[in-house]
């Protein structure tokens, strides 16, 4: 809805209020209730149909009096997102000293000081003024927050869940403003809840922006290392490469865990006999490890494509090129392990199903013997 439409609705509401007040008392009361409800419902529906960005733009375009009238009718649930969209001048006029907060999200800003990452306090818009970070990490950031931070640094920040296409050109590309976009999956390895988490990266003017919907151990580890070890990173690309390298290491640890679990399963399968209950448990473990192995293989191949994109684009310095090649060698090593684990999983699956078939054949033989023993003599 256009700003002019909101102006028209608010002006009509003001004129109706003036007319209502000029009526006699009895008619005034009836008209006031009916007209007030009608126009309030119309305004509420108009507000409901707008995004936070559209409402912020509308509030900036209205006169102060009209903006105050509209502001009073905006639901509290939308206030914080709209505060991110409004100009600072209009925000001060309507909300006083209230700053847009980062409720439900986590925004971390890091600058490079003496070869170490130093996290800067961030609670609202004013903390971005005069800042030249090397890494901005956003977890579960709203569209309004992404838009404001992106506009502040002159880059568009995507939703990490938007790009799920397998096409390389969709996941790894360079925008017209030289912003480098990469969309990758990182492993979240938790007992009973292991999955891939989409992460969007943007490299722009020496700043790495990372966007995701939940925290990852890989990111916590890299923040700790970069804060404590001088020279661990020298620029935003170093941070990106270290995150990819740490994800490969996390995948390696997960594969070691899969080896240990499958070794235990193998001992059970190689026993002289396996009950149906044991077989069911074994099949469950095997299926879980097969799923995890496939997830790891997919993630490291995704990382491999991202690194190849950076290398082909001549976006790395000579030392960074060596780091990327080392990560690729680690990925090649893991690929052979995932292939071996798939073979081992298939063997254990076939062996377990074989035991189930043996158990079924035993029961069939028993039923056959019982049926012959108790068969009537005249049938024999």
Enumerate the language-model features and the residues they cover.
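Extracellular-loop-to-transmembrane junctions of the mid-late helices
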Residues: 234-253
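Hydrophobic packing positions in regular secondary-structure scaffolds
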Residues: 1-98, 103
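Solvent-exposed alpha-helical segments within well-ordered globular domains of core cellular machineries
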Residues: 56-60, 72, 80-84, 96, ...
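Conserved residues at beta->alpha junctions
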Residues: 34, 139-140, 213, 245, ...
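A short, charged helix-loop
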Residues: 216-239, 263, 267-280
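Divalent-cation
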Residues: 93, 97-230, 234
């Amino acid at each position: 809805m256009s700003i002019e439409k909101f102006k028209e609705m608010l002006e009509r509401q003001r004129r109706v209020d003036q007319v209502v007040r000029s009526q006699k008392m009895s008619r005034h009361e009836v008209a006031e209730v009916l007209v007030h409800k009608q126009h309030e419902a119309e305004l509420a529906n108009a507000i409901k149909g707008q995004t936070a960005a559209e409402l912020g733009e509308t509030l900036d375009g209205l006169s102060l009096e009209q903006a105050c009238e509209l502001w009073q009718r905006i639901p509290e649930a939308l206030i914080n997102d709209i505060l991110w969209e409004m100009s600072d001048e209009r925000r001060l006029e309507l909300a006083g000293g209230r700053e847009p907060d980062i409720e439900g999200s986590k925004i971390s800003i890091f600058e490079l000081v003496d070869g170490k990452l130093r996290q800067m306090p961030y609670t609202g818009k004013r903390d971005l003024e005069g800042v030249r970070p090397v890494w901005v990490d956003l977890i579960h950031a709203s569209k309004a927050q992404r838009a404001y931070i992106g506009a502040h640094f002159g880059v568009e920040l995507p939703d990490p869940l938007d790009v799920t296409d397998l096409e390389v050109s969709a996941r790894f590309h360079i925008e017209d403003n030289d912003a480098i976009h990469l969309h990758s999956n990182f492993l979240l390895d938790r007992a009973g809840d292991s999955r891939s988490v989409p992460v969007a990266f943007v490299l722009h003017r020496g700043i790495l922006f990372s966007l995701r919907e939940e925290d990852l151990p890989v990111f916590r580890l890299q923040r700790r290392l970069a804060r404590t070890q001088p020279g661990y990173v020298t620029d935003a690309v170093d941070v990106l490469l270290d995150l990819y390298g740490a994800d490969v290491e996390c995948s390696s640890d997960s594969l070691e865990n899969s080896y240990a679990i499958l070794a235990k399963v193998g001992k059970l399968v190689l026993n002289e006999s396996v009950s149906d209950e044991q077989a069911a448990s074994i099949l469950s473990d095997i299926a879980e490890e097969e799923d995890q192995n496939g997830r790891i293989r997919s993630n490291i191949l995704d990382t491999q494509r991202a690194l190849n994109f950076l290398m082909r684009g001549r976006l790395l310095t000579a030392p960074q090129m060596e780091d990327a090649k080392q990560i690729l060698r680690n990925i090649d090593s893991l690929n052979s392990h995932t292939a071996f684990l798939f073979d081992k999983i298939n063997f254990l699956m076939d062996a377990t199903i074989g035991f189930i078939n043996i158990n079924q054949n035993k029961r069939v033989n028993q039923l056959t013997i019982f049926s012959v023993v108790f068969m009537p003599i005249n049938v024999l």
